[in-house]
Amino acid sequence: QLARPTVALITNAGEAHLAGLGSVAAVARAKGEIFSGLQHDGIAVINADDAYAGLWRQLAAPHRCLTFGMDHPADVSAECTLAITGSVVRLKTPQGEIDMRLSLLGKHNVMNALAAAGASIAAGVKLDDIRKGLEKLKAMSGRLEIKPGIRGARILDDTYNANPSSLVAGVE
């Protein structure tokens, strides 16, 4: 209650925070508590593709909600082509559409870009500024980083904090 945000974003609920909470449902409820601290005119930014999106909408009431996602209807969505060199994305928002190229690999990074775009829109940032910011992003060392191999091969280095979930995300 010390800082009352104007924008609160939940990307997802998963197994990463099970310690002390016991279940993914408990993680989702705990994450949803952030919405109770929003300013009266604050905006909740919610992943429409997450199984707990409905719960978060309920917890965010009476605040305005802005959703993002690729697989379910959302306020901020994308059409994209994924490639080994990055993603070509058409960002669709309530303010209009804009094309961009992301150097980050994988659908999960497109979802991260949608989350960032949603929070930025909620904060009043213009679409062109969102595009410029997202296009500047570069992969961290060991996070879906393309490295040259022998005979023209490419190696996908995802060794930083690798786990089964990150492996699946890398394959996608």
What function would you assign to each model-found segment?
Residues 27, 161-172:
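AMP-binding/adenylate-forming catalytic core of the ANL superfamily
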Residues 1, 32, 36, 168-172:
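Amphipathic, non-transmembrane alpha-helical secondary structure
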Residues 4-154:
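Acidic, Mg2+-coordinating active-site environments of NTP-dependent enzymes
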